[in-house]
């Protein structure tokens, strides 16, 4: 994982790249410089500067952690630390037991039995509107869904790299799981309890607290 490079306006950040947002090109030398303070980010041949403190900007496929803020009309609105709440449609979740069928009016009446206000969930960015920026998420994969028996931590989303795997397991005793949401929300949980409501043990609380404190120090 490459080191983060923090720059201020006027800092030289490279050459031979396509200049993205937060940069400008010197017309005489074609060198690329930062136009804002932030973190240098490169993807393919594009180089840009992301503001150090900004809202999360979603990409399709991002793994996220979010909090349900409202339930209505066959959908949930979810806080994902972005410029607007994300939408989770009833059709974009797994029904209990993994049943495959069309959602009906009865399901809409019992939506709070799936997720209710204040619940924490993991999911994936399904779509981002081209013109309105509307954020759609889904939890259809079995690895996503309701989160319990853990702690939520917020970090700067600009410091989180997009990786192949955002879900990790620490083989301590007891085992602790970590979900690094690309949106800056990090979830630390006791894996032995899974997603049930059984209280976690004192030993699990200590392990969770140790990992949480380590992340806070690094952030």
Task: State each model region's role.
Residues 1-219:
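Single-stranded RNA-binding regions, centering on S1/OB-family and related RNA-binding modules
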């Amino acid at each position: 994982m490459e080191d983060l490079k923090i720059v201020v306006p006027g800092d030289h950040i490279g050459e031979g790249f396509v200049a993205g947002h937060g940069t400008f090109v010197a017309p005489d030398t074609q060198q690329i410089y930062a136009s804002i303070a932030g973190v240098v980010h490169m993807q393919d041949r594009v180089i840009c500067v992301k503001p150090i403190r900004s809202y999360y900007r979603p990409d399709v496929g991002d793994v996220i952690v979010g909090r349900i803020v409202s339930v209505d009309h066959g959908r949930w609105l979810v806080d994902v630390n972005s410029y607007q709440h994300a939408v989770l449609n009833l059709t974009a979740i797994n029904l209990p037991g993994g049943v495959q069928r069309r959602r009906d009016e009865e399901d809409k009446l019992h939506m709070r039995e799936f997720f209710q206000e204040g619940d924490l969930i993991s999911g994936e960015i399904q779509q981002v509107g081209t013109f309105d920026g509307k954020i759609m998420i889904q939890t259809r994969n079995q690895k996503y869904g309701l989160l319990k028996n853990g702690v939520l931590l917020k970090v700067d989303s600009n410091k989180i790299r997009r990786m192949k795997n955002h879900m990790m397991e620490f083989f301590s005793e007891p085992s602790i799981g970590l979900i690094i949401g690309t949106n800056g929300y990090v979830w630390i949980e006791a894996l032995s309890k899974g997603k049930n409501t059984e209280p976690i043990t004192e030993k699990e609380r200590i392990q969770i607290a140790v990992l949480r404190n380590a992340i806070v120090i690094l952030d």
